[in-house]
Amino acid sequence: GFDPDLKAILEEQKKPVSFWEDGLGTFTLNRSVGWFETEAEWLGQPARLDFDRDENRADCLTHFHTLMERQEEWDQRVRGLAAEKLLDLANDWAQESEEGRETAEITQEQFMERMELDAIQIYEDGAFEFWFNDGDLFWGHSIHVTGSLTNGPEEAQMEG
């Protein structure tokens, strides 16, 4: 037979772990990656917000509220840094993909518009990671911007 105590423990571990946060929604533990996540609206578009379950929950939620209260400002800063760091690379990729055909240069504005926010990850110390779908700037790779609430966006790279 199967140990009933063990079965009870297993059943308990399968139950969803979640909590509600005003203004952000219901965070649910995603056990496969070890983080709490919710889907929120960022400038009218859906985006995942997540933080590692080992981080201080209250601090992470405070930092999410800080970002959410000034979405437009943070969005412009993060996209602006990504364009500053990656625009030349995007134009190199565009030239390569057209192999000799004349292609219009991608502008900073076009680059920023094509980025589609996928997720924001926050840490208890105020560090953050923004993950974007690339709008085919890099043939379907991700754009990853890291920084902190204190220093703003600092690094951007193409990944995946």
Language-model features: locations:
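Soluble extracytoplasmic regions of secretory-pathway and membrane proteins
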Residues: 76-105, 112-116, 126-128
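N-terminal "domain-start" segment
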Residues: 1-94
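Acidic, proline/glycine-rich low-complexity IDRs
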Residues: 1-27, 35, 104-160
